[in-house]
């Protein structure tokens, strides 16, 4: 047993003390149990490693341990909602994001806005991830009211071949935040052995959201990224650029050609660099 003023560390041999294994519901491969009062959080051996995009595994134990300590020592919870009902990415495909949020003491819920009739009062943030269909007028108004009441929104556009006409309400929410949807898919002509022209590794802007990623040389990888720009007539929100392409990229506006696996820059397309993500912040807050 080892300890300091904050933490006591006790190691048990589960073969010699099987009752402890049953009491703490440990995994046979090995488990670290964090306990504070009546609150417990288990981190198994398998949870300490995470696969990267190249198929290798890297150690995430420090992150998992930090989350576990936070889970058992903090009584403060933050509630966030993921919008459903418009073909958004299902929660079953967002297990890593959900796990990380819950590890940071967030309570994650799904929200069918048309059914509920409002964004819940305890919503500290609303996520809209990859919707295939537009919101209706009533839902749009509810979200705008939520934003006007200091709500926070994370919106990631999906791909729709009719995006120029199919998303007027989503476009209006972005316009309120000072961002314009240019209805074009980012193309990076310079191919590599790792990525095709539709796969973008963007450059970072200057904002607290992305500064740490830039400082630690962590890459963001995007596919079917949508070109955005500043909405010049927005008055309440100030957009700050987070992600952009190289100068060689362009925005393909002929989505029918793109669906047929063909693309060629012409006068109707948008010249790079393209802006791919913004943080819209209220000027008065």
Which residue stretches match the model-derived regions?
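Juxtamembrane extramembrane loops of integral membrane proteins
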Residues: 1-133, 137-140, 144, 158
């Amino acid at each position: 047993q080892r300890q300091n003023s904050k933490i006591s560390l006790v190691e048990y041999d589960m073969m010699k003390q099987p009752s402890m294994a049953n009491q703490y519901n440990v995994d046979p491969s090995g488990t670290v149990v964090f306990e504070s009062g009546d609150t417990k959080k288990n981190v198994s051996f398998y949870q300490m490693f995470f696969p990267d995009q190249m198929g290798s595994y890297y150690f995430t134990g420090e992150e998992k341990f930090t989350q576990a300590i936070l889970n058992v020592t903090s009584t403060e919870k933050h509630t966030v909602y993921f919008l459903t009902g418009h073909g958004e990415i299902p929660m079953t495909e967002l297990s890593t994001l959900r796990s990380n949020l819950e590890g940071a003491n967030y309570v994650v819920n799904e929200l069918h806005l048309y059914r509920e009739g409002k964004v819940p009062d305890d919503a500290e943030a609303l996520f809209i991830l990859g919707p295939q269909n537009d919101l209706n007028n009533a839902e749009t108004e509810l979200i705008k009211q939520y934003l006007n009441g200091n709500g926070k929104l994370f919106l990631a556009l999906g791909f729709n071949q009719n995006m120029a006409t199919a998303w007027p309400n989503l476009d209006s929410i972005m316009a309120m935040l000072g961002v314009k949807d240019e209805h074009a898919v980012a193309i990076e002509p310079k191919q590599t052995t790792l990525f095709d022209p539709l796969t973008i590794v963007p450059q970072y802007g200057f904002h607290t959201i992305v500064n740490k990623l830039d400082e630690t040389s962590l890459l963001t990888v995007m596919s079917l990224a949508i070109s955005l720009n500043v909405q010049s007539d927005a008055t309440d929100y100030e957009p700050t650029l987070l992600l952009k392409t190289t100068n060689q990229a362009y925005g393909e506006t002929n989505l029918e050609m793109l669906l047929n696996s063909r693309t060629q820059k012409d006068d109707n397309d948008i010249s790079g660099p393209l802006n791919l993500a913004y943080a819209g912040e209220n000027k008065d807050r």
